[in-house]
Amino acid sequence: MGKYTLKLDKDRLAESRKRVSDYYNGRPVDRIPFSFHIQTSGLPHYNYRQCNEDFSKFIEQTIAGVNAQFEGFPDTASMFGAEQLVVDENPPFTRGRVLNDIDGLDKLPAKVDPENDGWGKRLMQVCDMCMDAAGGEIPICVCDHQSPYGIATKIMDNENLMLAMYDAPEEMMRFMEIVTGAIDGTIAAMERLYGAKAEHIRAAIGPGISRCCFETDA
């Protein structure tokens, strides 16, 4: 696979990352930073199905639009067996649910293998290509986990999740721990494979977990 070339000002990148890191860690900053996504269609334009089935097209389009996001929300749910439906004009979405209700929780694996289960292998392939494209120098959002609850809604119906909070709080807590463990495991796999640069090929982890990537371009 060929190297995709980006013209990066590494001094400005370092300045931006330090400013954001200082701000989020309560250190003095010369001005308040903000992060943003560049809104662009990118050229050439490939639809969701083409990007999903041929990662080289996703990389080509993403580099054209830098922060154009790969919709990776289904990745973690797929590791638990959630079926993902790929279509042309929308991100993949989950067809059906693995669990009908919280009573079926024991059917769910207590631990997943993020490098091999579900779409985990695909995710690592995309990460390889992102590292080839940008060397970990800029954020490319390929793995937005949302939150443990958000992933849980892809495994069990949302209404039943809300009922379980009242009817079976202990089982619900265990469910959240299982899902959170899958998110942590995915992060650990990415860090093991890609080191410190992994923070630039995943999105912020979401509101349900304290760990977050704050070193991003501003």
Language model features by range: what are they?
Residues M1-R49, F58-Q61, N67-Q69, V86-T94, ...:
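Active-site loop segments of alpha/beta catalytic cores
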Residues F73-K111:
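A contiguous, low-structure linker/loop signature
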